[in-house]
């Protein structure tokens, strides 16, 4: 559980480990990881602003991708393969 305030706005959220960004109103609304303060350069419209940050492995058209929750996986048009990060390919 992280403490946060509602005075940081906007922030750029990374919904997918390794890519996939969207702009949130503030850090408290970021479903993924805050990658920077301010709007994303290439924001992805995505309603993933209220979901708990639960790492999941998402089966998408790019293969298995680690994401921060089911909503982020849905944003990729994928389905959750299992509720933990994907195994590393290395």
From Swiss-Prot:
**Cystine crosslinks:** 46-71
**Residues modified as Pyrrolidone carboxylic acid:** 1
> What GO MF annotations does this protein's record show?
carbohydrate binding
Key words, A-Z: Disulfide bond, Hemagglutinin, Lectin, Pyrrolidone carboxylic acid
Q: Which domain of life is it from?
A: Eukaryota
In its record, the post-translational modification comment is:
The N-terminus is blocked.
Function statement? Lectin with specificity for complex N-linked glycans and O-linked glycans. Has hemagglutinating activity towards rabbit erythrocytes.
* Name of the protein this chain belongs to: Lectin-1
Organism name: Hypnea musciformis (Red alga)
């Amino acid at each position: 559980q992280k403490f946060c305030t509602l005075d940081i706005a906007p922030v750029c959220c990374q919904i997918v480990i390794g890519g996939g960004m969207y702009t949130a109103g503030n850090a408290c609304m970021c479903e993924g990881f805050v990658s920077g303060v301010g709007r994303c350069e290439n924001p992805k419209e995505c309603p993933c602003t209220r979901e708990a940050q639960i790492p999941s492995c998402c089966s998408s058209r790019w293969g298995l991708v680690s994401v921060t929750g089911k909503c982020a996986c849905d944003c990729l048009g994928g389905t959750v393969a299992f509720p933990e990060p994907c195994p590393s390919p290395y």
